[in-house]
């Protein structure tokens, strides 16, 4: 801002809760993901992320499971995380992702 002759103030709010998945819903989502993607398509352990996520507020009220849906192969289309200027959504995963989400809803509603 200063280089353009303006000023700015930054306030940092440390108010996001830790996002913690409930065990039962995580196992439910994992089982269906394994049906849809197979063992080779499901990563069970990733490094913890230091980011804020609004879904954490929802998980304070109801049990649930936040998961990531892969978007591409390393170095290929869709390999950047969202909120990155190099991000390019991989349209090829739309039907696969929709299949998983539909299966989650369908199975939950039985």
Residue ranges and their predicted role:
Residues 1-110:
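Metal-dependent amide/peptide-bond hydrolase catalytic core
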């Amino acid at each position: 801002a200063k280089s353009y002759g303006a000023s700015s103030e930054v306030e940092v709010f440390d108010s996001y809760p830790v996002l913690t998945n409930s065990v039962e819903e995580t196992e439910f989502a994992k089982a269906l993901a394994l049906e849809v993607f197979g063992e080779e398509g499901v990563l069970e352990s990733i490094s913890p992320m230091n980011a804020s996520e609004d879904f954490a507020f929802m998980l304070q009220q109801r049990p649930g499971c936040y998961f990531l849906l892969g978007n591409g192969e390393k170095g290929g289309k869709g390999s950047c995380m969202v909120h990155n200027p190099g991000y390019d959504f991989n349209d090829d995963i739309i039907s696969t992702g929709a299949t998983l989400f539909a299966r989650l809803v369908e199975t939950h509603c039985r």
